[in-house]
Regions:
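Intrinsic-disorder/low-complexity signal
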Residues: 1-231
Length: 231
């Protein structure tokens, strides 16, 4: 993320019933403990040294509706920002005529419409059977702020879901994701039977090249990549 302000947005349009989706930002410390939030129940706050402002609560969307949260990243001391969309009442995410979340990178000098296209970095549909969508988590390290796209959902409650009601579940989920070590191609190759020989090399790619470097004894492409997975 390279901007002064991170802006979350949710847009939805109801199909059957009066539908209220609530955009929230949940902040966590380095140890994944609760560090505050901004949502329709708390429209603005100084969180971890940064100003965070919600655009306001909209409770129905017959013609479409949007909510925004602006987060000033300069000075923010917390380690994680979790984006949430809570279904309060109405159509499920799978039933709504339209439902999507995204984020923008905004600078102080920028002015224009809320959906100014050039500032939108990512936008994706919110669909699924859960009642609480967790589209993304933003995390900070020594090089700045970064986004990990999740596209996950919590089961939640039948109605009246709020960020206050699911902080514990959300923090546990984010911790498990951020601390998980994903398998690499090397990990899978190490699981194959046989004695490892450090002098052997393998080529892994979408397709086999016309020429191979000296020393490559195995070629893995999309045609046989599944062979790396042990039976």
């Amino acid at each position: 993320v390279v901007a002064d302000t991170l802006r979350f947005f949710i847009h939805w349009k109801q199909k059957q019933d009066r539908t209220d989706y609530d955009l929230s930002a949940f902040f966590m410390n380095k140890d994944y403990t609760n560090a505050g939030h901004v949502s329709w129940t708390r429209l603005s706050d100084d969180v971890g040294g940064a100003t965070v402002v919600h655009s306001g609560d909209i409770t129905s969307a017959p013609n479409g509706a949007s909510e925004f949260i602006d987060i000033k990243l300069n000075g923010l001391t917390h380690s994680y920002i979790v984006a949430q969309v809570n279904r309060y009442v109405g159509d499920d995410f799978s039933q709504a005529e339209e439902s999507f979340f995204g984020f923008m990178e905004r600078n102080e000098k920028q002015k224009g419409l809320p959906f100014e296209p050039k500032t939108v970095k990512v936008k994706s549909e919110v669909r699924g059977k859960g009642q609480v969508a967790v589209p993304a988590v933003f995390f900070r390290n020594k090089n700045g702020w970064f986004c990990k796209w999740l596209d996950m959902q919590l089961t939640g409650q039948p109605i009246c879901n709020t960020v206050e009601g699911n902080k514990a579940t959300t923090s546990m989920m984010i911790k498990s994701i951020m601390e998980r070590k994903n398998l690499t191609i090397k990990d899978l190759m190490d699981l194959l039977p046989g004695t490892q020989d450090e002098t052997k090399m393998a080529y892994v790619g979408f397709q086999q090249p016309e020429t191979l470097s000296k020393g490559i004894t195995k070629v893995m492409t999309l045609d046989n990549l599944t062979g790396l997975i042990p039976q």
